[in-house]
């Protein structure tokens, strides 16, 4: 088995779904590099553009409580048929943040398989995200994926 490790920042929208407790998320991320520097002033990090294609993310979020949710979806990497399918491990969390216009949350997803490069894939992806009052999503992923 081979490991693929990635970090990407997805941006897009969340909108109401088919029922009152369901949302649909659609985001995308360009190829990037993540720089993290630790120094005398503390820590600094940023995503910077890199040559390459985009990843497309689509999911369905089901709210299960005041701050909890379940999620399942797909991430397509590039223009080919390289897709990951994922679902929530236990529950995700979405709550208030220090910015009154933003909700903030985190979730861990299990890779349930995939297609193309990800056929038979397994692993986990963590997501730390914000959701604005207008439905704008910024979603930071860190994934460790096992492929054949």
Language-model-detected regions and their locations in the chain:
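Beta-strand-enriched cores of mature, soluble protein domains
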Residues: 1-148
């Amino acid at each position: 088995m081979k490991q693929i490790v990635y970090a990407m920042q997805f941006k897009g929208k969340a909108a109401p779904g088919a029922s009152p407790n369901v949302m649909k998320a659609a985001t995308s991320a360009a190829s990037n590099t993540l720089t993290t520097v630790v120094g005398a002033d503390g820590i600094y990090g940023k995503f910077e553009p890199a040559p390459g294609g985009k990843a497309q993310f689509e999911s369905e979020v089901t709210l299960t409580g005041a701050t909890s949710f379940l999620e399942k979806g797909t991430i397509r990497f590039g223009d080919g048929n390289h897709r990951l399918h994922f679902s929530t491990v236990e529950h995700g969390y979405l709550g208030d943040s220090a910015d009154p216009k933003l909700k903030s949350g985190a979730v861990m997803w299990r890779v349930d398989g995939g297609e193309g490069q990800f056929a038979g894939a397994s692993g986990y992806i963590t997501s730390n995200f914000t959701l604005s009052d207008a439905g704008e999503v910024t979603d930071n992923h860190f994934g460790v994926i096992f492929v054949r």
